[in-house]
Amino acid sequence: MTIFKNRFFKKYIIFFFLIIFLNFFLNKEIVAHELWLEKNSNLKDKTSIDIMIGQNFKGTPYGFSNDEKEKLFLDNNNIVKDIKQRDGNFPAIQIELNDNYFNIINYESKYSFLEYDNIKTFEDFVKEQNFLDILSIYNSNKLPTENYKRFSKILISNSKDFFQQTSKLDFELIALNSPFDKSNVFFKFKLMEEGKPLGNFQVTIFSKTKENFAQETIKTKPNGEGKIRVFDDRVYLLSAVKIFKPNFIQNLELKSDWVSHWASLTFFPSYN
C-alpha cells in the first residue's frame, strides 16, 4: 500500500511540474497564440475536450485551470448550463453529452498580460490580423504591452438537430446552420461583438486531416455573416482576432498599451 501511494505521489508531482513547465515556457514564447477547443476521444464514458494552444491548428493540450477561466458553459437550445471542472483535469474538459442534440461548449478565458520582446513581432502580428492602421499610431520607441482574452467554442452533435445560439460572449462566432447536417453544403456563421454583427472583418479558416493542412482568409459581409464549404473528413477551426486600444476603464484595470480579443469555433462534420 505504501509503495502504491509513493508511486501515485511521484506521478502526481511529475504531472504537476510538467503543467507548470508547459504553461511557463509556452506563455513566454507564444505571443498570444490561438486557443481552441478540440475533441479528445480518450475517455469512453464521457466526452473529453482538450484546451489547445498553438498556431496554424497545431498546438499543445493544456490541463484545466480555474484561475485562467472566466466562463465555461454548455448551450443547448439557448439553455445555459455551467460546466464545473477540477484544476488539473487532463483532458481539460470532461462532460457527459447527449450527441443527439446540437451541443455548443463555450469557454472564455481571463485576460493574460504580455510584453513583446521586440517591435517586429508586434508589427508582424498586426499585419497578419489586418490592422494596418495601428502601424501609424503605435509608439515604435517602446516595447508594446498587451492583454489578450480568448472566446472559444466547439460544436458537437451526431444528428441534424440545430438551434441558433443567441449572443452570450463579448466576441464570438455563431453558427447559423449545422455542419453535421449533410444537406448543408456550406457552413454559415456570424461574427458578433457585444451582441452586434461585425461586418467586413477578417476571419481565418483552418482545416486539417491526418495528412494535410489548409488555411484561407475571408471577410464577413456587412451583416457579419460568412460561409465556407465543408468536407466530412476535415476538422475545422474558424478564428477572428480584434486588436484595439483600451478605453479609460480598461486601461485602469489592464494597464497595457493594447488589448486583443480572440474568437474561435471548431467542429468535425463526421463526429458520427
For the regions a protein language model found, what residue spans apply to each?
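Glycine-centered loop-to-beta-strand initiation motif
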Residues: 88-91, 219-234
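Short acidic/polar inter-strand loop motif in beta-rich domains
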Residues: 110-118, 244-249
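Short amphipathic beta-strand segments in non-cytosolic proteins
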Residues: 70-79, 202-218
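Start-of-domain marker
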Residues: 31-94
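A short, solvent-exposed beta-strand micro-motif common in secreted/extracellular proteins
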Residues: 104-108, 235-243
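Beta-strand-rich domain onsets/edges
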Residues: 31-46, 125-187, 192-197, 209-211, ...
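N-terminal secretory signal peptides that target proteins for export/translocation
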Residues: 1-9
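Bacterial N-terminal signal peptides
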Residues: 15-24
